[in-house]
Amino acid sequence: MELHEFNGFTYKSNEKDNTLPLIQIDGKKDKPVFVTKYYSLNENSINALINSYFYASHPFELNDYLDASSFLLHTTGPLDFKFYKNLFGNLLDNEKLQELYKVDNTEKESCRNYITLFWETISNIFGIISLSGSENNNLMWPHYAQETGFQLKFNTEELEQSIKNKIGKNEVFGLFPINYSEKLVPIDLSKFNQHHIPFFYLTNIKLKSWSYENEWRFIIGKNYMGVPYSKSPFELKPDFYVDIKNRFAYYDSNIVKEITLGHNYINRTRFHIDRVSEAITILEPIPNSESNINIILLDFISENLKDKLFYSGVIYDKSDDGISVIRTKERMEIIKIENYKYQLTRTYEVIKFP
């Protein structure tokens, strides 16, 4: 067993105890009862919804280039030769391997060749699924859904169990809370006999400025998940993919608790809108390049989530301190009247987010 502590978090590896998870991360945070996932409005998001999967992102695909970066790994001393043999043994003969080890374990190089290949290798066999422990946040809707996408809500325990049942418990790690820190401190590889803790550490630390996300993560581990080198700046290596679906993590479709559409989703750039009454609106997607995803989305909701639909809203909220503007969501009813035509009905059941 190895142990690492940083910023109030404890990272523990259990390589020799098969009765325990390979890695345990204790952030002294209570797991939320519900977690949410925000989606922008595009074909990939709709496919993920209707096929009940999350895309487990490669670090190159994250919106913070410091997130899970190889720069979060460093050394203050030489690494054991066994690490080089395990990583480079099939690529170099013994003489070249010894030469690489000697050069790489200098103060100037600081094991950069090892760190680079180690990171590239593990990034091909893991992916990150980011969720939020907050049902509402004034920044999450514009940042991740552009106020036009949608949000899914899950019971945390149901989601964890569902993903583990679908892809195998040994391929799922987490749910872990993110360790938000004032500074990004790289972890010293030379302090560890195995590199499980350094790997999970680099996937778990973010600057405190991101703490508004209240992020919780699954780490998915599979073979040949792929490395999208083309998404890395100035990188000339070709993308490596066997099957993009290796980055999909499926869940049971019936565990979605709610779907909330963004406040700006329904507008006249997307729909012909007929206000039948204050409560009832008829929607017809406008034929254009985007209309197909709107049809697929509303068909799916009306067939599978019609009793779980909400719409993001805004109201004036009166209190002893005066009037303020707050976000809300209102439960809606949806019926598919005919092909490409939908009836949306307000229920006036409004949830406030102060």
Show which residues each predicted segment covers.
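Partner-binding and oligomerization surfaces adjacent to conserved cores of proteins
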Residues: 1-354
